[in-house]
Curated annotation (Swiss-Prot):
Compartments, record wording: Cytoplasm
Active-site residues, record numbering mapped to chain: R55, S106, E176
One cellular component (GO) term of this entry: cytosol
Residue ranges the record marks as coiled coil: none
Cofactor: FAD
Entry superkingdom: Bacteria
This protein's encoding gene: murB
Entry EC number(s): 1.3.1.98
Pathway(s) where this gene product acts: Cell wall biogenesis; peptidoglycan biosynthesis
Sorted UniProt keywords: Cell cycle, Cell division, Cell shape, Cell wall biogenesis/degradation, Cytoplasm, FAD, Flavoprotein, NADP, Oxidoreductase, Peptidoglycan synthesis
Name of the protein in question: UDP-N-acetylenolpyruvoylglucosamine reductase
InterPro entries for the chain: FAD-bd_PCMH-like_sf (IPR036318), FAD-bd_PCMH_sub2 (IPR016169), MurB (IPR003170), MurB_C (IPR011601), MurB_C_sf (IPR036635)
Catalytic activity: UDP-N-acetyl-alpha-D-muramate + NADP(+) = UDP-N-acetyl-3-O-(1-carboxyvinyl)-alpha-D-glucosamine + NADPH + H(+)
Amino acid sequence: LEFAAGIPGSVGGAVYMNAGAHGSDISRVLVKALILFEDGTIDWLTNEEMAFSYRTSILQNERPGICLEAVLQLEQKERDEIVAQMQKNKDYRKETQPVSNPCAGSIFRNPLPEHAGRLVDEAGLKGHQIGGAKVSEMHGNFIVNAGGATAQDVLDLIAFIQKTIKEKYDIDMHTEVEIIGEKR
């Protein structure tokens, strides 16, 4: 689970969207998850039943629900080795991502084999700002709050990035963040 060090969110959210980093993700360690479905039923789903793929699970579309509990099968390692790998991952995140700025994490899923941040950078969008929402100068796949950003500013900037990448590269950019609630 060392790959997850520094990923913002919860275990339930990580299961919901198959969170991952550094070449691994939740699908590689999940045995089963207890799910509360939209209809109010609660049931265990196995890893296979979760139908994981890149940053998605069955919970996002076919069987909407939330993860209440998760059983994970982790690899046994020496404590020092685990701590060292976690620190390495956190350090990498600090060096390459704007973790000191208010943001929601990675905005777009990587349109494999491309990398979302690289596409945004190559399109010349780093530093582009709408209202208080700004594409990070450090990493193109992050939108930071440059001061007073509203949800609408962020949504407008996301839409602008999607439109620009589609026009320049004919690639559809899908959000990794889940947008819920009112957009104020």
